[in-house]
Regions:
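C-terminal accessory segments of proteins
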Residues: 2-367
């Protein structure tokens, strides 16, 4: 059974090779998890193998970890997001599902319950959702907050490296011994005909994008609805979400990123960014070079002089008029020096809470 000395390693193994099941050996010691009936119950695609076959499936496994069995909750609602779908915190449904999963991990009474629940959930849930929720929980739980959490790029390099370079990396990993591998040069396929290519190095910089991902780990939007929680659970949720100076740091962080972006633009003979106008065309094009192998999709490009259009999807509806209204309300709140909370009580922004309140409301609740 897992002991305090190897809990850290076992949690780290849950993040490794996210598209391979837990009973496949991972890590330098070729360690696999020993599965049980509870695991197969929530992972029916492996049920045909049976417990004994799963636990002897990988002949290269040198160590088999047996996790203490504990009751596990239902993941039925969270399973609505398929494993092969993209995950984004800017989609309300995804955010809600992430909140529910964070709640599950956060409310586990001890490390045994957390490890077993995470092991069972890992191979049935969307890998990006699982990584996000477990990382948020581990960063904020008192018994795991001191554990080093692996970075997103270590286990999802396809989000940060183009497919060509990733294919070369896989070839080296499979065919060449670790001591004989050579660095892979990531070439920039750019053209002078598109001015936006001059700043590709900044927009798709690994550090900048990792910072954005990590920001949402440290400052998550929140968990599921508070109505069904006990008073203690509500207070615990507030400790995760309502951190001191969160709104102020949100504003400062974005101000600094824009300042650096404008600096890079000036260094590349480009003008500073213009104020966003929801009704006008955007002059510059944008052609991202990255995608994601799991979904087989590339990020959508933006052609020159493109205008904002309504988005009407089954699970994600956004209308330009609505966005413009929210933007106008933010400006109005700033100009009037007050905002109206849910109880319709004016709250002046003359206090220290001013920037905190504004920065806290802007990310997900502009209205």
């Amino acid at each position: 059974y897992a002991t305090m000395s190897n809990f850290k390693r076992n949690f780290h193994l849950l993040f490794e090779r996210p598209h391979q099941p837990v009973f496949i050996a991972k890590g330098p010691k070729k360690t696999a998890f020993k599965v049980c009936e509870e695991y197969l119950k929530v992972n029916p695609r492996y049920k045909c193998l049976g417990v004994s076959h799963c636990n002897s499936f990988d002949k290269n496994a040198e160590e088999l970890v047996e996790v203490k069995r504990t009751p596990i909750p239902s993941f039925d609602e969270i399973l609505e997001l398929k494993r092969d779908e993209n995950f984004s915190l800017f989609i309300p449904k995804h955010r809600r599902l992430a909140g529910k999963l964070i709640d599950i991990f956060w409310n586990m009474p001890d490390l045994d319950h957390l490890l077993f629940t995470a092991m069972c959930a890992r191979d049935c849930l969307n890998p990006y959702l699982f990584h996000y929720a477990l990382t948020v929980a581990m960063l904020h739980r008192p018994d795991t907050k001191d554990m080093a959490v692996p970075t997103f790029v270590e286990f999802f390099p396809d989000k940060f490296v183009d497919a060509k370079a990733l294919a070369e990396l896989k070839d080296q990993a499979i065919l060449i011994s670790e001591n004989s591998r050579k660095p892979i040069e990531v070439t920039e396929e750019v053209s002078d005909k598109e001015v936006e290519h001059r700043l590709m190095y900044f927009r798709e910089d690994m550090g900048v994008n990792l910072h954005h991902w990590h920001w949402h780990l440290v400052y998550p939007h929140g968990t599921s609805d508070l109505e069904d929680k006990t008073e203690a659970q509500v207070e615990a949720t507030k400790k995760i979400v309502d951190k001191d100076r969160r709104g102020e740091l949100f504003y400062y962080m974005h101000q600094q990123v824009i300042a650096r972006y404008n600096y890079e633009r000036l260094c590349n003979d480009l003008k500073k960014t213009k104020k966003l106008d929801w009704t006008k065309e955007i002059e510059e094009a944008y052609f991202p070079k990255l995608g994601t192998l799991k979904t087989g999709m590339s990020y959508a490009a933006r052609v020159a002089n493109q205008k904002f259009q309504d988005l009407d999807r089954e699970e994600d509806k956004r209308y330009v008029d609505e966005l413009k209204k929210w933007s106008d309300q933010i400006y109005a709140a700033i100009h009037h020096g007050s905002v109206i909370d849910v109880s319709k009580t004016p709250r002046t922004v003359m206090h220290r809470l001013t920037i905190r309140l504004l920065g806290t409301r802007m990310p997900y609740q502009p209205h």
